[in-house]
Amino acid sequence: MEINIKEKNDSIILLNLKLKWEDIKSDYNDVQNKILSSSKEKGARKGKLRGIQKDIFLKNNRDYINSNFVDHALNSYYRKALQEKNIIPINQGNVSDLKFDGVDTDFEFTIEFEIRPFIDKKIPNYEKKVTIKTNHYIATDSDVDKALDDLRVQHATMKSHDEKGKLKSGNFIHADFTKLDDSGNPVEGGTLPNHNIKIGEGLFTGDLEKPFINKKIGDTVKITVDQDSGKVDYAVKINKIEEQILPKVDKGFVKIVDSKLKTVEELRKKFKENIQLNLDNENKKEFHNKIIEYFIEKTKFDVPPSMVDNYRSYLVEDYKAKDPKAFNEEKMAPQLDEISNKNIKWLLIRENLVEKEKIILGQDEIENKIKDMMNESPEYKKDIKKFYNEEQNKNKLREDILNSKFFNKMDSFFVNKTKEIATDKIKNKKG
């Protein structure tokens, strides 16, 4: 068997096989005899054709025999060639240039298939301490103030106004929202009863806030709201007005939030530390994402099309499941193609790096991680155990642990050159 291999690109192989009749004669006869053994002809027992009956049968069924041999030969010789050349395909493969005319003729075909590309020599020299630039945001007192305000809202109480109480910005109302037609008349079935909103927040700011200020229980306010379908008029009848009473930030409030703390200063310090920890983690995430971008950009190779197509199909199904109405596959096609290509490229690069750096994940590590989670949250022990009994969830945990070990290793090869930026500067830019 003559085997010729041509690399179409990094991930696509053209395999050409040529076999002389002498090499395939025995296999051809085996196929022919198998067909003869199951043949049924008048005047002869099943599989017992002799003489002229056999000759006539073979003549009449030669195309059928040839077709069966080709099916057998393609699979058999292709498999032998792969074993001989130690090649592992990752897709079905497409056959072309098939040449075989039956008895006494040679057999030749070409098959195109994909492989996982060999990228060892394409990986950049990352061991030279590559510098990655990132932004490192620093928490400020205004972050702490915002966190405390959010916490005060969580512990707030509501005070209802009497009929004389006037509505102020920041108050909540319970009101009937009735849609009006072009003539200003109520639309039948167009009332949203006792809807709860906060005046001075979200939609009800600016021009939509002003008509409500100083109104009382029982008053009706007419407003015009910009919606997707156009401007819509509403009559809003106020049924109830509530004022949000925020707790004072003092020692009593501190005790409610965290019984281990004693002073407001301690609470602010803890909040700031937690906020900074989150910002530090965001910086680390940015650092790792830029390491990924570095490898994707610097490692040049052709990604297997079938792997990209399969990942793209997964993305499409995932988007459809999450929000079928909003998802437009045709519109998102360029992004889907780019995301799929990048993810598969990174999958193959990381696979190579994990092997090169001998990053190993033992089964005990996964089980120990699950045990640690159960020990940390004993009240949820049964739920945690049940969750990780599902193979899909355990595989995700395995991937997370492997990813953590991988980036711990990569951290030693890359320098995170941070630019410290106070979060106040970001807020000022947005403002």
Protein language model regions, located:
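FKBP-type peptidyl-prolyl cis-trans isomerases
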Residues: M1-G431
